[in-house]
Design a protein with these regions (language model features):
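A donor-sugar binding/catalytic signature common to diverse glycosyltransferases
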Residues: 92-93, 100-103, 115-116, 143, ...
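Active-site and donor-binding regions of nucleotide-sugar-utilizing enzymes
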Residues: 4-7, 13-30, 51-54, 64-158
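Leloir-type glycosyltransferase catalytic cores
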Residues: 149, 315-359
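Nucleotide-sugar donor-binding patch of glycosyltransferase catalytic domains
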Residues: 56, 290-336
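Short acidic-hydrophobic, aromatic-tinged amphipathic segments that line or gate anion-handling sites
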Residues: 63-67, 145, 164-165, 258-261, ...
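A nucleotide-sugar donor-handling region in carbohydrate enzymes
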Residues: 43-47, 66, 139-211
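Donor-nucleotide binding loops and adjacent catalytic segments primarily
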Residues: 42, 50, 182-274
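N-terminal beta-loop-helix "entrance" segment that forms/cooperates
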Residues: 41-59
Length: 359
């Protein structure tokens, strides 16, 4: 079985890492299976890309396209590669432009697509990610769902075949890669932080990172927290701040907010584990907060990870200053979530694909 995996953004590197491990494990057990990685270049700087490959022991990409966020350029670059390779399966992850570009190009060439993290819905049609998810699920042959809710979403859209509830590969990754306690403490000491006495905040979605009013409100709210806040600034957010003097002043006046460059995955896991609170607009970090036992406030009005809200680990706050502060001070009930499975989701995915292709 020959696989081409198409990835391009940080969350996809994490998910692909555990699936790559499962593929290597099957190959060592004698299965005829090989994988080649195509990196679209959607995340292109060192911390957002190469560092993750190094930390996660991901094989070097066979192809690196440097396409940025240009989906049509991605498709034009992916097409000749898939035509030459003719893999049995193309694997795509999540909801980025790389996801949809890979899925559409493979489908146009008659190559079956496996969508990992299928069936998620925020029910916000203005989000590009929502469009990418829906289109990719319509194209895919195999739809690997992290939760029962995702399965129900697909069934409600009339998609019932090729749907598998396998658990969450991000939980696999957290189980494998979370640093030991001593390493966690050494990481937070680099930032002069004390365990469970700081918040970690991230802002990266275009709807937030390119919205100066939203960023102003968020920075004002962060400045009013009664604890230090570590803010690894995503390149998109940093670019907006760089071109807006008001945002720069707000950050300078927020004396409790420590702005740093983006951190690697292992560092982020340690920071999440030892933080008192996570504040984010990231989908993945909402789950990681639960995996690491840390409450989360999400800077959005809706989420595709409804289980985290229903179980009392995650409050939806939007981007208004008062809404954020209110959410921070609301109690978190922190109930157990069964949905994310047992840390062996990647193995289940590869076994299903291998059995189907070799029938």
């Amino acid at each position: 079985m020959r696989i081409v995996t198409i990835i391009g953004a940080r969350p996809q590197f994490i998910k692909a890492a555990v699936v790559c491990r499962a593929i290597r494990q099957m190959a060592l057990q004698g299965a005829e299976i090989e994988e080649s990685i195509l990196h679209t270049g959607q995340h292109y700087d060192y911390t957002m890309s190469e560092l993750f490959f190094h930390q996660l022991d991901l094989p070097a990409p066979k192809w690196h396209l440097n396409c940025g966020n240009d989906m049509q350029r991605m498709k034009a670059s992916i097409q000749p590669i898939l035509e030459a390779e003719r893999p049995d399966i193309v694997i795509v992850y999540g909801d980025t432009y790389s996801t949809l570009a890979g899925a559409e190009t493979a489908a146009e060439l008659g190559i079956p697509v496996a969508h990992i993290e299928a069936g998620l819905r925020s029910f916000n049609p203005t989000m590009p990610e929502e469009h990418n998810r829906i289109k990719t699920d319509q194209i895919a042959t195999w739809r690997f769902c992290p939760t029962g809710t995702a399965v129900v979403n697909l069934h409600n859209e009339g998609i019932t075949e090729g749907v598998f509830h396998v658990g969450d590969v991000m939980y696999d990754a957290a189980c494998i890669f979370t640093p030991k306690e001593e390493k966690q403490l050494s990481i937070i000491r680099q930032y002069h932080l004390t365990a469970k006495e700081f918040a970690i905040a991230t802002i990266h979605r275009a709807a937030t990172a390119e919205n100066t009013e939203a960023l102003s409100n968020i920075f004002i709210a962060l400045s009013q927290l009664p604890m230090p806040v570590l803010l690894p600034l995503h390149p998109h957010t940093a670019k907006t701040v760089e071109h807006n003097s008001t945002l720069q002043v707000l950050l300078e006046q927020a004396t409790n907010v420590q702005v740093v460059k983006p951190v690697g995955y292992l560092e982020m896991l340690a920071l999440e584990r030892l933080a008192a609170l996570i504040i984010t607009d990231s989908g993945g970090m909402q789950k990681e907060a639960y995996f690491q036992g840390t409450p989360c406030v999400t800077l959005r009005e809706e989420t595709e990870w409804k289980e985290t809200v229903e179980a009392g680990w995650n409050h939806l706050a939007g981007t208004g200053s008062q809404g954020i502060l209110d959410a921070i001070h609301m109690p978190f009930s922190r109930q157990h979530i069964e949905e994310y499975s047992d840390g062996h989701s990647a193995e289940r995915i590869i076994h299903i694909l291998y059995e189907d292709v070799n029938r």
